[in-house]
Amino acid sequence: MAAHALLSPSSAHRWLNCTASARLEAKVPDQSSSFAEEGTLAHAYCARGLKKFLGLPTDGEDKEIEELDRYHTGEMDECVEGYVAQVLGKYRSSLIKTHDARLLVEQRLDFGGYVPNAFGTADALIIADGLMEVIDFKYGKGVRVEAERNPQMMIYALGAYEEHSLEYSIERVRMTIVQPRLANISEYEIGIYDLLAWAENTLKPRAGMAYKGEGSQVPGDWCRFCRVRGMCKALAEDCLNTAERFSDPRLISPEMMAREVLPRLSAVKTWVGEVEEYALRQALEGQQYEGYKLVEGRSVRKVTDQDGLAAALSEDFSDDVIYKPRELRSITDLERLVGKKRFAEVGSPYISKPQGKPTLVPESDKRPPFNSAEMDFKDIEVK
């Protein structure tokens, strides 16, 4: 997606729910990060793998790989291989049913008929009679992404259908998100008429409001990646008013904890961090906050000349005293270096994984309920 596009498919979950957010975000420049660059590199490897299979040129991907290859790891290779295999498996299945099925890689799509001045690039499309496939690769592992009624995927599906519906008799769309670092392959299938009804009744009117900056600011889980979340008044009021929702300010019942408090914890914690970061950034740029001042934070001493310090200390102490013992890199680092599969092959006999610390999550979380010997045989006493 072009960086300057106002209503991008990747942020559709946000501007569909909070139509005011798009114009507010446009006032704040987007900042790149090492995570974004890492994802760009992984996408380039994915596209190059598929294009090589199709015999297509890979000049653009080669350039990106050359520029960003400092992020390349064995883990990335495994993720790319898994994605390419997934796409090609779907493509071969489509060819059995539609002999002229097409696999399109990094396909530019136009959905301006539904979202003003909007276009985007789909990672992979398989165009065939009957069932069309839309496949999206996500290298991030911070948030698990599901395909069910995912607006980004549905917008891509619309663009693909608009472009290819005259060539193929498309009746349904299967949308697949491949998120290998979370072992997540999520699929969702929808009929074309249902997709078009959603586009006319929901997407088009909400996108029109978002493009004009109309509507109220509506806080929700879509605030997570909003560029104005640290200064959004609606989100601030929502977080600050959380405690005031309780009928009894002295005690919180289990029912109230489940209904009012726990669902808000993640959003409130994230908001607090964002406000701190935003306020500090503004203060560094000269903004004055009454009752507050900038001071120098805690500093950690650093050795500027390790060889020189070691030589000075070696006059009185042996090497085994002044040097730390050699130690292995962390398991995560080793997996990234050699790849998860290879590391599991050679390293599993030497690694154990204890039971994880219990944590409260919504019922919708796909992990099994926590169970321990203590919970099986004794009541839990909370002090």
Model regions and ranges:
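Extended, charge-rich alpha-helical segments
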Residues: 270-383
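DEDD superfamily 3′-5′ metal-dependent exonuclease/proofreading module
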Residues: 40, 49-50, 54, 59, ...
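Metal-dependent nuclease catalytic cores that hydrolyze phosphodiester bonds in DNA/RNA
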Residues: 1-132, 172-174, 186, 265
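Short acidic (Asp/Glu) and glycine-rich catalytic loops that position anionic groups and cofactors
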Residues: 19-25, 135, 176-186, 227, ...
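Mg2+/Mn2+-dependent nuclease catalytic core
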Residues: 37, 41, 99-208
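Hydrophobic/aromatic-lined pockets within catalytic cores
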Residues: 50-54, 139-142, 157-165, 208-211, ...
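Alpha-helix N-cap/helix-initiation motif
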Residues: 31, 144-146, 254
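Short, charged, low-complexity amphipathic alpha-helix
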Residues: 174, 196, 200-267, 368-383
